[in-house]
């Protein structure tokens, strides 16, 4: 993973856009990125946090497993890894998401790919806002916040 880098200066969306989407070793673009940006900004404002930048990097299981092994010393597949670069309430970080896991989890949970992707994307933002999910109480709070955020998505034009 010598090529791991901060994604805030890449050319895709430009450094002026605080929410950027990239793909690493896969061909993927989220549906309706403009709507997703407005939604994420609304959630961050709802959490009374300050957005500096969030980079979403969509990848496959292999890529995310390597990050998990190298940076977290976990030898397991995961759907998301969030790297915060600032303490809350400042939102600044990279969110790596395995599209392979999103497909599999959507099937397992009986939801659409888009629903699962939205939940995982906002899960990363909530980590950057300061929410944890290490113990049962924190997991319950995180799920509640995800549900609130998903309801906010319905209010975004």
Task: State the predicted function of each range.
Residues 1-117, 129-157:
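An acidic/histidine-cluster motif and surrounding catalytic segment
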Residues 122, 126-130:
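Short active-site segment of divalent metal-dependent hydrolases/proteases
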């Amino acid at each position: 993973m010598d090529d791991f880098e901060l994604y805030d200066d890449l050319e895709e969306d430009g450094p002026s856009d605080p929410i950027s989407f990239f793909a690493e070793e896969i061909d993927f673009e989220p549906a309706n990125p403009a709507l997703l940006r407005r939604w994420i900004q609304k959630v961050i404002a709802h959490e009374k946090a300050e957005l500096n930048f969030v980079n979403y990097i969509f990848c496959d299981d292999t890529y995310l497993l390597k990050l998990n092994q190298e940076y977290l010393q976990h030898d397991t597949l995961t759907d998301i890894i969030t790297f915060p670069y600032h303490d809350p309430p400042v939102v600044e970080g990279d969110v790596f998401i395995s599209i392979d896991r999103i497909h599999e989890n959507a099937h397992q949970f009986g939801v659409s790919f888009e629903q699962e992707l939205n939940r995982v994307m906002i899960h990363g933002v909530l980590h950057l806002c300061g929410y944890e999910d290490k113990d049962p109480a924190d997991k319950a709070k995180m799920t509640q916040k995800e549900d609130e955020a998903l309801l906010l998505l319905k209010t975004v034009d």
